[in-house]
Amino acid sequence: SEDRLVQQTFTEHLENMLGWESVYAYNAETFGPDGTLGRMSERDVVLVRDLSAALERLNPDLPAPAREQAIDKLTRIDFARSLVQHNREFHGFIRTGVPVEWRDAVGETRYARAQVIDFRNVANNHFLAVRELKIQGVRVPHYNRRADLVCFVNGLPLVFIELKAVYRNIRAGFDDNLTDYLSEHSIAHAFHHNAFLVVSNGDQARYGSITSKWEHFVEWKRNSEKDKGRVDAEALLDGMLAKERLLDLVESFILFDESRAGGTRKIVARNHQVL
């Protein structure tokens, strides 16, 4: 289909130009620790197998129970808390590490922060794009949804990309799909770790945050002067999903603003603020 063609183009760009790995999950995914993604069920939105490997790689001095504690904290869903509350806490964990504690050999309590992403050495992280990922809601009636493209770093779903056929208005991706997915009764838990959202039809592309209204979804204009003739979608992929750039955005260019009425707003920098 047209939508799949756009998906394929995006995925190939991530793989061939930006060095991501990719998996096509739809109807092909197997479950269990040795399955395609290591998910136990369609409700899992963190790839624990990848996260566990990253925690071990980035925290060689932490004992296994401390790493397990970090996984528990990064995958916990608290039904009393909102999407934004989860997202803010997890963003802090991703940037500065997950607080863990354990008892050492002599019974003393030790404290540390488990690093989840290596912001200094990009090659120390695992970048995986998954197409057509089936996700089931954690609240009754457990709706089933299918995500076009989810970009994971060390098993955490940091970027969610909704794709439309090239002749469709990209606003449809927001109105018809993202708005539904972000609802607590749908698959909001898939966005607890999200850095930003992207909607595109393969030509036009815009990005925003989990709290953005459509009018606050913006284009990633250009990465440099030589980009003048390129389509928006390509400029956005290169500008936001090149590995170094994505980690830079996550570490330094996302903030939560409580200055206005109506609750916390999550803000992702515009490209002129980053370049």
Regions found by a protein language model. Give the residues of each.
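ATP-dependent helicase/translocase motor core
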Residues: 1-275
